[in-house]
């Protein structure tokens, strides 16, 4: 069954997500970009709050929307984020010439790294093939431009199916604990297609917020999403709140 990853920006949102049925807690600042990073102090506070509350859910955090060069800056940020106590560190991998060197360097980090392939310009087959041959904790596909629709508006289902199949069948990831996930402005209405793809996890932010992805996490929307993912309710979202 596909697990539910919910992206949060604060202690309060993290506790709401944990209580509302999230299987993964993902830490990022939506107002700072697709993979916007949170301050290190906030990462430490959220991890401590979840563990103090008794939650053992896996926690991931992004390093922020950093360019892959200079590589030293990326690796320094990876180490700093990992030191905050998160279980996984997510790093965006755009389709550019620096991706191969970045993937090789990230694979050597003493942390559980999840490269996140940015799908807006398409996936470079050679970059995905390289990543699948390296000992990463998992691989994801996501979108950068959240105003361009959901992931399904950027990649068609056959391409997504091929991505998931390649992650699961290739290199050190095959038969291991490596995870294959999808994200990218996913909506409640996308759930039938998400279920059909059966990724290990699917990431949500916009669908569980009041207003856009920069708004506050909405417990009612989270409950509706959780129930819908498990087939408990029809796929109809809560009514939109009127904006002032």
Predicted feature descriptions by range:
Residues 1-4, 53-67, 109-119, 163-183:
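Short beta-strand/loop segments at the ligand-binding rim of alpha/beta enzyme cores
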Residues 1-7, 47-48, 243-244:
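N-terminal amphipathic alpha-helix/helix-capping segment at the start of soluble metabolic enzymes
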Residues 5-9, 25-36, 62-64, 86-100, ...:
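Catalytic beta/alpha-barrel core
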Residues 9-20, 66-83, 122-133, 186-201:
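Catalytic cores of alpha/beta
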Residues 20-25, 82-88, 108-113, 132-138, ...:
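Glycine-enriched alpha-helix->loop->beta-strand junction motifs that scaffold or abut catalytic
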Residues 31-50, 68-74, 93-110, 121-127, ...:
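Active-site-adjacent beta->alpha loops and helix N-cap segments on the catalytic face
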Residues 39-57, 156, 160, 168, ...:
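P-loop/Walker A phosphate-binding loop and immediately adjacent motor/lid segment at beta-alpha junctions
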Residues 69, 181-244:
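C-terminal alpha-helical cap/extension of soluble enzyme domains
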């Amino acid at each position: 069954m596909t697990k539910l990853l919910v992206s949060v920006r604060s202690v309060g949102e993290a506790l709401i997500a944990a209580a509302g049925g999230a299987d993964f807690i993902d830490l990022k600042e939506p107002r700072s970009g697709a993979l916007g990073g949170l301050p290190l102090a906030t990462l430490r506070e959220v991890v401590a709050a979840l563990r103090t509350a008794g939650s053992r859910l896996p926690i991931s955090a992004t390093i922020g929307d950093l360019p892959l060069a200079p590589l030293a800056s990326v690796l320094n940020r990876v180490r700093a984020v990992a030191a905050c106590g998160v279980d996984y560190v997510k790093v965006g991998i755009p389709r550019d010439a620096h991706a191969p060197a970045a993937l090789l360097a990230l694979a050597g980090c003493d942390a559980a790294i999840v490269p996140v392939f940015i799908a807006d310009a398409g996936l470079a087959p050679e970059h995905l093939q390289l990543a699948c041959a390296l000992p990463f904790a998992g691989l994801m596909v996501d979108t950068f431009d959240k105003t361009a629709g959901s992931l399904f508006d950027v990649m068609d289902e056959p391409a997504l199916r091929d991505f998931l199949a390649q992650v699961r069948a290739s290199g050190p990831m095959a038969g291991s604990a490596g995870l294959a996930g999808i994200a990218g402005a996913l909506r409640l209405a996308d759930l039938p297609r998400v279920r059909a793809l059966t990724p290990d996890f699917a990431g949500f932010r916009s669908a569980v917020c009041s207003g856009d992805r920069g708004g506050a996490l909405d417990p009612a929307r989270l409950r509706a999403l959780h129930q819908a993912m498990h087939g408990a309710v029809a796929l109809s979202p809560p009514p939109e709140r009127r904006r002032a």
